[in-house]
Design a protein with these regions (language model features):
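Short, T/G/N/S-enriched strand-turn elements that build extracellular solenoid repeat scaffolds
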Residues: 5, 31, 82, 105-108
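Leucine-rich solenoid repeat modules
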Residues: 84-197
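The conserved beta-strand core of Leucine-Rich Repeat
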Residues: 1-55, 59-77, 88-100, 114-125, ...
Length: 197
């Protein structure tokens, strides 16, 4: 872990960062990561950050636009979500968690800048939350590293797939709304000449 923290401390202008399969101790890493404020795309297991800091504050990441977050602990996940909601540029958030059902409502309600919330787990939410265009459920990429590499280099990745799924969801909702809507003046005009027997 010391090597990772050392490398990161020497490179402060990082825009794309993925930290996976790390082994502790994580304290040096957490303190270095909070100083890399230039990161825009970030993928990490929240355990690396929250292990000893249950109230890890995401607000230092002012430039963060895309966050792929693995959450293994509900209490820590809720604490992290509260500060995530205040990030001014965070528009894309992916959750890989068994606690997605508990976290999605918090994020949808409190994240005004969030445009896309991806869940990689099956979830059972109320109808209004499932109808929210920001929420998209996907299968996890088979090759995370390859997917991350493609996205970091401007190619198609799971974010692209999620945006396409979001567009399909919006089209389906518009089509459903057209199917069930009745133009009341036309309905009245069409039925006004009917006589009751």
């Amino acid at each position: 872990m010391g090597v990772v923290a050392e490398i990161l401390s020497m490179n402060r202008n990082i825009q794309n960062l993925a930290l996976w399969s790390l082994e502790g101790p994580f304290d040096p890493l957490a303190s270095v990561i909070t100083q890399i404020i230039s990161v825009q795309r970030f993928s990490i297991n929240q355990y690396y950050l929250f292990q000893r800091q249950p109230h890890f504050d995401w607000t230092n990441f002012k430039n963060l636009t895309h966050l792929d977050l693995v959450i293994d602990d509900l209490e820590l996940g809720i604490a992290g979500c509260k500060s995530l909601c205040s990030l001014p540029l965070l528009t894309h958030l992916a959750l890989n968690s068994g606690f997605t059902e508990q976290l999605v409502p918090i994020l949808l309600t409190n994240s005004s800048n969030l445009k896309l919330l991806v869940s990689f787990c099956a979830i059972d939410l109320d109808v209004d939350q499932m109808q929210d265009l920001r929420l998209v459920c996907l299968s996890a990429p088979i090759e995370w590293q390859e997917d991350w590499y493609y996205g970091a280099h401007g190619r198609l990745d799971f974010w692209s797939e999620a945006e396409t799924a979001q567009q399909r969801k919006a089209r389906r909702q518009r089509a459903r709304a057209r199917d069930v809507s009745i133009d009341l003046p036309d309905f009245i005009a069409a039925t006004s000449n009917l006589r009751l027997a």
